[in-house]
Amino acid sequence: MGLAVAKALSLQKDWEIYILDINSERGAETAKELPRTTFHYANVTKYSDLAAAFQSMFQQHGKLDFVFANAGVIERTNFYSTPQAENDMDVCPPPEPDLPSIDADLKGVVFTAYLAQHYFRHSPHRGHGGSLVMTASCGGLYPSFYSPLYSAAKFGVVGFMRSISQHFHASGIRVNAICPGIVRTNLVDSAGWDSFPPGRFIEVETIARLVLQLVDGGEPAGRGLTDTTGRHLPLEELYGVAVEISDSGFYFRDQHTFCDEGMREVMDATVVENQVGAVLNG
């Protein structure tokens, strides 16, 4: 999906594009194929890698307009497996679970958002008009039974996006998350994809088109966006939105309604301005 977005941006001559990837060979080849595109190695689970990439970009261009936090992996081990023991007296703790999906899919997004806000705010526009789009998943809205760690990370992305969006928006930065259904990427192998309903796959070009609409503030640019149900969000409301994408269209997904007014008051009190000097250090 990241490649599809890069290709779509490369067709618009006013974009300088940076691709970050852990696969140096693939990233370098892609950068050669696309105009105005630079590759920078980065393991998104390592803050120093991401910081170096952002710094290199900013030193070269002096501004940042859009960031697509898209890198992701899924767990390859069975969370539900139970190692066998000779008898109940020989039972030992199981090996520590492998957590690459938590590290890449959630921690990597947190690092990316943290760096994005810094360089957005140091750009000439001081953040106004900046766009950060995060890749969550349908597994961030519904339980993904065979990949609970991936699902936990993607639920985390949606919650993280909603939590930062208001404060980012105060600086003019729009933060949104896409929650696609199944898209044939390298997330799983062909046997894995074959276990899903064959008629429900989404083309990567569909994802890229929606991402660019979020970046542009709608279609036409700046006019807001209308989902498949006909619900329209004007530009000034097009932030903090989780956009679910299926093979049939895309849908704005609201956060849960408050159980009562008391809970609304509690959560309203968490705005950053209330907590600086209280819970937060200045």
Curated annotation (Swiss-Prot):
<feature type="binding site">
    <location>
        <position position="183"/>
    </location>
    <ligand>
        <name>NADP(+)</name>
    </ligand>
</feature>
<dbReference type="InterPro" id="IPR020904">
    <property type="entry name" value="Sc_DH/Rdtase_CS"/>
</dbReference>
<feature type="binding site">
    <location>
        <position position="150"/>
    </location>
    <ligand>
        <name>NADP(+)</name>
    </ligand>
</feature>
<dbReference type="InterPro" id="IPR036291">
    <property type="entry name" value="NAD(P)-bd_dom_sf"/>
</dbReference>
<feature type="binding site">
    <location>
        <position position="70"/>
    </location>
    <ligand>
        <name>NADP(+)</name>
    </ligand>
</feature>
<feature type="binding site">
    <location>
        <position position="185"/>
    </location>
    <ligand>
        <name>NADP(+)</name>
    </ligand>
</feature>
<feature type="active site" description="Proton acceptor">
    <location>
        <position position="150"/>
    </location>
</feature>
<keyword id="KW-0521">NADP</keyword>
<feature type="active site" description="Lowers pKa of active site Tyr">
    <location>
        <position position="154"/>
    </location>
</feature>
<keyword id="KW-0560">Oxidoreductase</keyword>
<comment type="function">
    <text>Short-chain dehydrogenase/reductase; part of the gene cluster that mediates the biosynthesis of PR-toxin, a bicyclic sesquiterpene belonging to the eremophilane class and acting as a mycotoxin. The first step of the pathway is catalyzed by the aristolochene synthase which performs the cyclization of trans,trans-farnesyl diphosphate (FPP) to the bicyclic sesquiterpene aristolochene. Following the formation of aristolochene, the non-oxygenated aristolochene is converted to the trioxygenated intermediate eremofortin B, via 7-epi-neopetasone.</text>
</comment>
<feature type="binding site">
    <location>
        <position position="23"/>
    </location>
    <ligand>
        <name>NADP(+)</name>
    </ligand>
</feature>
<comment type="pathway">
    <text>Sesquiterpene biosynthesis.</text>
</comment>
<protein>
    <recommendedName>
        <fullName>Short-chain dehydrogenase/reductase prx7</fullName>
        <ecNumber>1.1.99.-</ecNumber>
    </recommendedName>
</protein>
<dbReference type="InterPro" id="IPR002347">
    <property type="entry name" value="SDR_fam"/>
</dbReference>
<comment type="similarity">
    <text>Belongs to the short-chain dehydrogenases/reductases (SDR) family.</text>
</comment>
<dbReference type="GO" id="GO:0005737">
    <property type="term" value="C:cytoplasm"/>
</dbReference>
<feature type="binding site">
    <location>
        <position position="154"/>
    </location>
    <ligand>
        <name>NADP(+)</name>
    </ligand>
</feature>
<dbReference type="Pfam" id="PF00106">
    <property type="entry name" value="adh_short"/>
</dbReference>
<dbReference type="GO" id="GO:0016616">
    <property type="term" value="F:oxidoreductase activity, acting on the CH-OH group of donors, NAD or NADP as acceptor"/>
</dbReference>
<dbReference type="GO" id="GO:0044550">
    <property type="term" value="P:secondary metabolite biosynthetic process"/>
</dbReference>
